[in-house]
Amino acid sequence: MLDPFSEKAKELLKEFGSMNEFLQAIPSLVDIEEVMNRLKFAKESEISEDILNIEDIRDLASFYAQIGALAYSPYGLELELVKKANLRIYTERIRRRRKIRSDEIGIEVKIAVEFPENDIKTLEKVYGGLPEYIVSLREFLDLVPDEKLSSYYVYDGNVYLRKDDLLKVWSKAFERNVEKAVNIIYEIRDELPEFYRRLAGEIRSFAEKEFSDKFREVQAGELKHHLFPPCVKNALRGVPQGMRNYAITVLLTSFLSYARICPNPPRRNVKIRDCIKDMRVITEEILPIIIEAGNRCSPPLFEDQPNEIKNIWYHLGFGYTANPTLEDSGNSTWYFPPNCDKIKANAPQLCTPDKHCRYIRNPLTYYLRRLYLEEKRRAKHADEGSDKGGKERILQ
């Protein structure tokens, strides 16, 4: 198997019915030790031949076991480990394959068979031979927007690639597909067998040893408004009558509370008292933002419906009350942020997607992803600064 997101892989998965059914079957196909062995080699210089030559169905089971486990921590150390290990496996398999067919990898690729006669000599001179593959210009720019087109041969709406160039484009598609798969399974993680939760714990422990010195896990902390999804930013500006209760009580209340208190909840039925010891986190940091947004509505929500504040507490899991204590947590369900499909259905005006919304299924995972990317940039700049400082010390 060259790519778990290829058409060939999808055909194999059809034998199980749906992805959910395949996820239910995986614990009977592979065990946690086998899945972890696939990840632990990431620290080794060579990949085991047993891993490279595993049968297709076990390969898919091991890979999607990791994706299922990532649903419990979609953005963080674990994602870095899973992407790193699997990119090495599938990259090595692709390198070993003499010719790659379109149905074997997760991007639309064709074999380059025809070239303008006048360009053949130039191509052979620049590439040291004729390029082997073709990818549409549109897909190329989508996957590797920072690449300089002047470094490639472009003709008739296609980019001509050598195998190493194709691997560069494919790896970007693979990473994007991993995130897409995790976001899909995130929505059904409460239906998964206990196997995935245990595997998630094993992956977390190993990932902390592998990456903790370079990358901090996304944790509860001060809200970063500039990283909020568009739907939340729109709700914060205030909305007209007809959308107020959904935007403020349902969306903002759930999003702000989880984003501040428990951005990466281990399960859906968590209680606020499991996550904080001081109610001031809610009364001083979260509730004022909700009330301000309600006051920006037309007409102002809490002037028009003063008892709606009790409904806010109800959605936070404290029951229908105006003055709860921490001990009241659990008297009702702490509502999880609605997914993107529900927001589109109930308040379509809130949904104005930006470039970060692609493949995201829930506003909370949008926020997690933005935090994750910001942390990656911080770690990268820290490494670059460390390298620069080291060079300066050497020169001195």
Swiss-Prot record:
Binds 1 [4Fe-4S] cluster. One of its GO terms (biological process) is DNA replication, synthesis of primer. [4Fe-4S] cluster binds at residues 231, 340, 351, 357. InterPro entries: DNA_primase_lsu_euk/arc (IPR007238), DNA_primase_lsu_PriL (IPR023642). The keyword Metal-binding applies. Its cofactor is [4Fe-4S] cluster. It holds the Pfam family DNA_primase_lrg. One of its GO terms (molecular function) is 4 iron, 4 sulfur cluster binding. It comes from the Archaea. SUPFAM superfamilies: PriB N-terminal domain-like. Keywords: 4Fe-4S, DNA replication, Iron, Iron-sulfur, Metal-binding, Primosome. GO terms for cellular component: primosome complex. Heterodimer of a small subunit (PriS) and a large subunit (PriL). Both participate in formation of the active center, but the ATP-binding site is exclusively located on the small subunit. Regulatory subunit of DNA primase, an RNA polymerase that catalyzes the synthesis of short RNA molecules used as primers for DNA polymerase during DNA replication. Stabilizes and modulates the activity of the small subunit, increasing the rate of DNA synthesis, and conferring RNA synthesis capability. The DNA polymerase activity may enable DNA primase to also catalyze primer extension after primer synthesis. May also play a role in DNA repair. Belongs to the eukaryotic-type primase large subunit family. HAMAP family: DNA_primase_lrg_arc (MF_00701). This is DNA primase large subunit PriL. It comes from Pyrococcus furiosus (strain ATCC 43587 / DSM 3638 / JCM 8422 / Vc1).
